[in-house]
Amino acid sequence: MLRMLLSYLKRLIYKESVAIKIKTPEQIEGIRLSSQLAAKTLKYIEPFVKPGVTTLELDTLIEKFVKDNGATSATKGYRGYKHASCISPNEVVCHGVPNQYVLKDGDILNIDVTTILNGYFGDTCKMYYVGIPSDYAKKLVETTKECLRLGMEECKPGAHLGDIGAAISEHAHANGYSVVYEFCGHGVGLKFHEEPDVQHIAKRGTGPVLKQGMIFTIEPMINAGKARCKIDRRDGWTARTIDDKLSAQFEHTILITEDGFEALTDVYGDF
């Protein structure tokens, strides 16, 4: 318990000396195109998310769509991961391994896709309703979407990275939810994971100052119950809530612009 507490406290205060790469205009355009493809992949798969379909079937469709559009999946082969996406139903917080789980009416589902197009990375995820969700599940999903929006609204030159996590955690806690602190957002674009870590629970005024040309993900994971996670020992990836209560997540790849931000993966304006 003490170790968990120390881990939590470390996430409240950022190191100020993190080296964050500023992308060039050429790099930004490449990352933008890859990010748009990632968003289009999530849109493509939407009609297939329905009762009776397995998460492995969804992953197979995603892999083909990405390949047909001249890209590859960053997750496939990453540290031995075997699939083109992470698909996380219900109590799965993140990194859900596609398998023979059959979707059923009332499930909530997160699909996370990272594309590599011409060497550039774009990363996004969103929630889907399988059939008709319960009011309990819908409130969690909609609050998580609001958390992402509030985090993005903090993004502008001169703001601190910690302002993002503060906005997210304030809204989640006000609605009776917890914020996962064992996983976070990250720099992205030239690599799958770059500096900085983007914590979703943090103190305002802490962390590096945001500058034009920075690109990173914001991807809050909000739990209906406790914040802690447990890793499935059978696959080494799937992270579930410690109490098996529902979890939800949304993610955009964010570019800091001259006077604010651009969500590079926001092609359709649906979250």
Residue ranges of each PLM-predicted region?
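Active-site neighborhoods and metal-handling regions in enzymes and metal-associated proteins
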Residues: L2-F271
